[in-house]
Regions:
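Thiamine diphosphate
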Residues: 5-182
């Protein structure tokens, strides 16, 4: 590949870790395992993600697989759908769940229904990774938990891990799934 590994990969030793580090490990391991996996979203590259979940990935995998986007949640979702339909396995990061609402047209009318609209002959293997809930002093537009809303959409899979161990395992499972998963 045209990039060189500058950052150290996460440790694979059995250790106590944080939820955030578990997410970082899951993304890193799947990008290492499968060249079709890539990360796309606001500030995921140079900045390392809003909370640091993608720190080091840009240096390790390059700009072709760690893609910084403008502030356009609908664009992130649309790019993920298009890439998924061509055989890629995108992980789209939407920084706060509040802004999943901006991408609902793509997620509800396209990603969730592709398998059914094409009689099972098409798949949309993508993950939308986001953060939900209060506690970070995010204010009215950065603290909602809209999980219940997205669970009501037929065809979307929704995963809400409660601990670091489950977060890593379920993220890996979500990336390998052949349907759209909201994580």
């Amino acid at each position: 590949p045209p990039h060189r590994r500058v950052a150290e990969p996460p440790s694979r030793r059995v250790t106590e870790t944080t939820y955030l580090e578990a997410i970082r490990q899951g993304i890193w391991e799947e990008m290492e395992r499968d060249d079709r996996v890539f990360l796309i979203g606001e500030d995921v590259g140079v900045y390392g993600g809003a909370f640091g979940a993608s720190a080091g990935l840009l240096e390790a995998y390059g700009e072709a697989r760690v893609i910084d986007t403008p502030i356009s949640e609908a664009g992130i979702a649309g790019a993920c759908i298009g890439a998924a339909l061509t055989g890629m396995r995108p992980v789209g990061e939407i920084q706060f769940m509040d802004f999943v609402t901006i991408s609902m047209e793509q997620l509800v009318l396209q990603a969730a229904k592709i398998r059914y609209m094409f009689g099972g002959k098409a798949q949309c293997p993508m993950v939308v990774r986001t953060m939900a809930g209060a506690g970070l002093r995010g204010g009215a537009q950065h603290s909602q938990n809209l999980t219940q809303m997205v669970t009501m959409v037929p065809g979307l899979k929704v995963v809400c891990p409660t601990n670091a161990y489950d977060a890593k395992g379920l993220l890996i499972t979500a990336i390998r799934d052949n349907d759209c998963v909201i994580f």
